[in-house]
Design a protein with these regions (language model features):
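Conserved tyrosine-mediated DNA breakage-rejoining catalytic core shared by Y-recombinases
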Residues: 35, 40, 44-74, 208-210
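Key DNA-contacting residues within the recognition helix of helix-turn-helix
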Residues: 43, 104, 129, 152-153, ...
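A short, basic/aromatic helix-end/turn motif that makes direct DNA contacts
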Residues: 44-50, 141-149, 156-157, 196, ...
């Protein structure tokens, strides 16, 4: 049946982001609402995890595509702040990493300016909901870091059914396979798994490439 979540008003969020194009609160809210990062992930995020060329945020358990608004914000902050500290979110005053409490307080002030009674976890949940409205379970599991079973248990009412172009693995199996491919990277095993999974190649076809 799922849960009922406290969701922000989209128009209000866009107004807040427009007022904060590259400030710390602008970065915090974009990372939570547009990228689905938790408060601890925002606190710990470092510049070497932001892949501007690949347009993704590389977290320990997942890679999250960079939304254009987030990319623009982080590019400007990178120019201004990257040489001062390796952390993405730092204080404008001290130029040091913000503790979690300061991140919550700064985001709260920005959200209150538009009467949004939500917190950073609510923004992460809203990210998951929006992803489920346009993508399948395995994809949302990959970008959110949540297991498919957790997503189904909490967010099932938000999933939009779409016709499948081809038979797929059971969602949890596909997510686990994706994790293995991520861990193997460009190794022989990783490439073989990727070719068999995504390109539907047979073992003999893969061997002929070697």
């Amino acid at each position: 049946m799922g849960h009922t979540f406290n969701r922000p008003d989209e128009a209000a969020m866009l107004r807040i982001l427009e007022r904060h194009p590259h400030s710390p609160e602008g970065a915090i809210l974009r990372l939570a609402w547009l990228e689905g990062l938790s408060r601890s992930e925002i606190t710990e995020l470092r510049w070497d995890q932001v892949d501007f060329e690949g347009k993704a945020i590389q977290l320990p358990d997942r890679a999250v595509p960079l939304e254009p608004s987030t990319e623009a914000c982080l590019r400007e902050r990178h120019v201004r702040c990257a040489l001062r500290d390796p952390h993405v979110v730092i204080s404008e005053r001290s130029k040091k990493p913000m503790p979690p409490e300061s991140i919550s307080r700064l985001s709260r002030l920005a959200l209150d300016s538009e009467g949004q009674k939500v917190n950073l976890m609510d923004l992460r949940h809203d990210f998951v909901i929006r992803q489920l409205q346009t993508h399948d379970w395995p994809y949302v599991a990959r970008v959110s870091g949540m297991a498919v079973s957790t997503l189904r248990g909490s967010f099932s009412q938000y999933f939009q059914e779409r016709p499948s172009a081809a038979p797929e693995l059971p969602p949890d199996s596909e997510y686990l396979l994706w994790r293995i491919v991520q861990q193997e990277g460009s190794s022989v095993v990783g490439l073989a798994l990727w070719m068999g999974w995504k390109l539907q190649m047979q073992p003999g076809e893969i061997l002929n490439l070697t």
